[in-house]
Design a protein with these regions (language model features):
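Helix-terminus loop motifs that line ligand-binding clefts
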Residues: 344-350, 363, 379-495, 622-636
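Extended, well-ordered alpha-helical scaffold segments
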Residues: 283-309, 323-330, 379-392, 452-470, ...
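Hydrophobic core
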Residues: 17-25
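Terminal accessory carbohydrate-recognition/targeting modules of carbohydrate-active enzymes
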Residues: 31-323, 358-359, 366, 377-381
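Well-ordered alpha-helical scaffold segments within catalytic/enzyme domains
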Residues: 311-320, 369-382, 437-452, 585-604
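Conserved oxyanion/phosphate-binding beta-strand-loop segments in alpha/beta enzyme cores
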Residues: 124-136, 314-358, 397-404
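Carbohydrate-binding/catalytic loop surfaces
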Residues: 347-362, 404-431, 479-575, 630-651
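Catalytic cores of carbohydrate-active enzymes
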Residues: 301, 463-498, 585-651
């Protein structure tokens, strides 16, 4: 059955893009007009910067926004007007040291011009120019307007590893203009503070330079290997490259002057590539050849792609309030900058919450579903692949680490897996899942694209994930789920939550030499703080007061942890003593989405099953989780066997 595509703005998802809020609507009436040009959306997102080694500003967030595209793992800024030492090049780049943003330079490559006349050589001072620094959707531009010439720089991403830069010098005079042309750049030596050396050096390459990296595995700050490489390649044949003795700065000089006829122009191009492995670098070298041989093709394709994004969201409806238009474009720019292509353990393209925040260069089973719904309106393949990226690591029954969690989607994935998986990453998290929004995301992709093959691909995976909630997160098996956590080492380590070896913990026991507390059967007990933290993270609400251990008021016994067991009495997870209304509302909606998918795929029995289950869950929520006096829904406190229930109106 064909699915009619929905209008992006007409359905009011413009605010959903920027805020990622479910259910926000904006009523807009509009008529077809000419499409909006990309040049009408200059600098709707501020990427101006004067980047430094100490990249972070407030809350471990990059002090400046940057631009990236196509899933590249590096990005650029426009220089601040006041940062005149950066004139002549694009500020940056910022690279992702596998999981962390780092400024490689304040300007890795700047052009220098000298005017040659009969009277001698005159250095051209770009700080005397009238300048424009512009971020259009999909590209950065700089314009330096001087008396005799205009210098124009444009930057786009040509591939998911390479930026393509166009340099145009226009002779504004009626006479021939002769110029000496060179480029220079340098490396930062440390990240965050002077004690953290980046281990980078420069070497000469054909038609350019290479930044070499050392193997540095700082789990929580900076992770590189000797295979990493940042390469600059110019489409200039006759050049001389000089590198400083400390291998941190360089100059590339054209051996012959550039001669520009009256009222004519000179064009040249370069690429800047950041790759993680030798194989990536080899592949990208071939891509660079094509980029430099056919630059106009790539600039045209880039413009068409971004114009397509804008045309799709407006669907030629351009009399929408200007602020809403800008918000929509700004949202797309944000999503595309946060697009990351396969690298390391990440197998499919996806979107991270923020390229700027230190701890957010990964993909979460929570943020991703919302990003998928937004992205499917203008980049359908990226939306599909973002779903796949998380399901690539869906737990299976033959998993070597946690087969008891078959069906689960783990909390988040990063470039590096954790030690249990043979990696050395610290951010990869399998301790908990996230709220059940995956089916909602897939349903939205299908309704937007009509791709039944994608629906067939995802349906059994979604069913397995849905079932997991009822095998591993339902302590009394009443069909009502609770938030909790996986069987995970961090949940048993009491010393990680402020307890000391030998400490007697009232109601639990003594912390042994391994940091564990054992019950009378010798089984490890989940540390309450660890268990509550995992459950709170699983909710997506993290530090919400509804998860305070002490509860609220004299009649509230607070949070307790219950172990969920299989038929062999083996632990397969744990939950808190709360049937959460939000989780079960998500699961109710998910049953509806699964019913709809089953109908589309012709699975009649499944459709009937989910219809029945949804009705039962709806009745439970309305009868047991709603308080008529206050007019709100609340969580229900439960004991382990489900014989005692209490509506938590006090929270």
């Amino acid at each position: 059955m064909g699915i009619k595509k929905r209008s992006f703005l007409k359905k009011g998802l413009i605010l959903g893009l920027s805020c990622m809020m479910i259910g926000s609507t904006v009523t807009i009436t509009s008529a077809a007009q000419e499409s909006k040009s990309l040049t009408e959306f200059a600098n709707v997102l501020d990427v101006s910067a004067d980047p430094k080694e100490a990249i972070y500003g407030t809350y471990s967030t990059n002090e400046y926004n940057n631009f990236s595209d196509l899933g590249a793992w590096h990005g650029y800024y426009l220089h601040d007007k006041s940062a005149t030492d950066l004139y002549g090049g694009f500020a940056g780049p910022v690279i992702i040291a596998e999981e962390y943003p780092v400024n490689l330079s304040d300007s890795i490559n700047k052009i220098n011009l000298e005017k040659i006349t009969a009277a001698g050589i005159e250095s051209i001072d770009l700080t005397k120019a009238t300048t424009q620094e512009i971020y259009y959707p999909g590209r950065l531009e700089q314009i330096y307007d001087l008396k005799d010439l205009t210098l124009k720089l444009k930057l786009i991403f040509g591939t998911n590893r390479t930026a393509l830069i166009e340099t145009v010098i226009e002779n504004k005079t009626d006479e021939e203009l002769k110029l000496n042309v060179s480029w220079d750049g340098h490396l930062f030596t440390y990240y965050t503070n002077p004690n953290n050396k980046m281990g980078t050096t420069l070497t000469k390459e054909n038609n350019g330079i290479r930044v070499n990296f050392e193997t540095i595995r700082s789990t929580w700050n900076y992770m590189t290997t000797e295979e990493n490489s940042f390469d600059i390649v110019l489409n200039e044949d006759d050049i001389t490259t000089e590198i400083s003795d400390d291998l941190l700065s360089y100059t590339i000089t054209r051996n012959e002057p550039v001669v520009i006829d009256a009222n004519s122009k000179y064009e040249t191009y370069q690429t800047q590539s950041f790759t993680y492995t030798t194989d990536e670098r080899t592949t990208e070298k071939q891509n660079v050849v094509d980029l430099l041989e056919n630059p106009n093709k790539y600039f045209e394709e880039n413009n068409n792609r971004w114009q397509g994004y804008v045309d799709t969201i407006f669907e030629n409806k351009t009399n929408v309030n200007e602020n809403y238009q800008k918000a929509a474009v700004k949202s797309i720019e944000t999503l595309m900058t946060n697009w990351f292509s396969p690298a390391g353990a990440i197998k499919h393209d996806g979107i991270v919450p923020s390229m700027s925040y230190k701890w957010f260069i990964g993909m979460w089973a929570w943020d991703s579903w919302k990003q998928v719904v937004a992205t499917t309106y203008f980049n359908e393949e990226l939306a599909k692949n973002n779903v796949r990226a998380l399901f690539d690591y869906q737990i299976t029954s033959d998993d070597t680490v946690r087969p008891q969690d078959a069906g689960a989607i783990i909390d988040c994935i990063f470039y590096n897996q954790n030690e249990d998986r043979g990696g050395d990453g610290g951010n990869w998290n399998e301790r908990n899942s996230k709220p059940a929004l995956a089916a909602w995301a897939v349903e939205n992709v299908y309704r937007q694209t009509g791709d039944k093959e994608f629906l067939k691909e995802m349906y059994p995976k979604l069913v397995a994930y849905h079932n997991w909630w009822y095998t591993n997160r339902d302590i009394d098996q009443n069909g009502i789920a609770e938030y909790g956590g996986m069987v995970h080492e961090t949940c048993y380590d009491w010393t990680g939550y402020g307890y000391e070896i030998g400490q007697v913990v009232e109601g639990f026991g003594t912390v042994n030499d391994q940091g564990f507390v054992l019950d009378t059967n010798g089984e490890r007990i989940v540390c309450p703080e660890a268990g509550i933290e995992a459950a709170a993270w699983e909710s997506g609400m993290d530090n919400a007061t509804r998860f305070d251990r002490e509860g609220n008021g004299p009649d509230d016994k607070g949070i307790e942890i219950y172990t969920v067991r299989n038929d062999s009495h083996d632990p397969i997870g744990y939950v808190i003593n709360q049937e959460s209304v939000d989780l079960n509302a998500y699961l109710y909606a998910e049953k509806g989405f699964l019913k709809s998918m089953a109908e589309e795929l012709g699975y009649k029995a499944d459709a009937e099953k989910y219809t029945k289950e949804a009705k039962q869950l709806q009745e439970y929520i309305n009868e047991n989780m709603y308080d008529e006096e206050t007019g709100f829904y609340y969580d229900v406190q439960t004991n382990e066997d489900g014989s005692v229930k209490k509506l938590l109106v006090n929270r």
